[in-house]
Amino acid sequence: ASRQTYVAGFSIRQTGLLLKEKILDYAAKLTRQAVYNMDIADGNIVRTTDGKVLMSLSELAMHAQYNPNDSLHITAESTYTIRNNAYSFGCTFAEVEVDIPMCKVTLKDIINVHDCGRLVNPALAEAQVHGGMSMAIGYGLSEQLLFDEKTGRPLNNNLLDYKLSTIMDHPHLEAQFVENAEPTSAFGTKALGEPPACSGAPAIR
């Protein structure tokens, strides 16, 4: 869903902090250091006063799991009720060539721009936009569900006759982003699921 990172982000952050607290509590028993003097950095338990590595997380996990005296699974879980919402904004620019006698529209160029907050995974965000643009090109140029007027039964109810657009129908798909971090989000994110598919077809039309 579009809001998954926005909604789940709060639970992920909250649960991560709980897990960190449990890890440091366990590390305090092993290292005889005060919890408030330790932190986690680069996969290690470090002393905050001088940055000294006290032990690695893998060493801590091995000790917790295989300690014969008191084996322990260090886990955390929590529940978070989301009470906010964030709105994404985007637009599409399309250049088309129209052959009026042949009633044919050819898409020459298209660009999709989105303000979806901070990009957690830029490569995946670009791929998501490309997928939405492909859907929009199909909506605008080739997809139409046809029905038999007498029976009401669909005439092109398979992927051979229902003409989805493919990469052979596309020009270069350009995706750009405006990263305005969302203050109500755990990681500054907004939505980027459905929005890329919304404005493409109207732009082509």
Where are these regions (language model features)?
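C-terminal catalytic domains of large/alpha subunits in multi-subunit enzymes
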Residues: 1-205
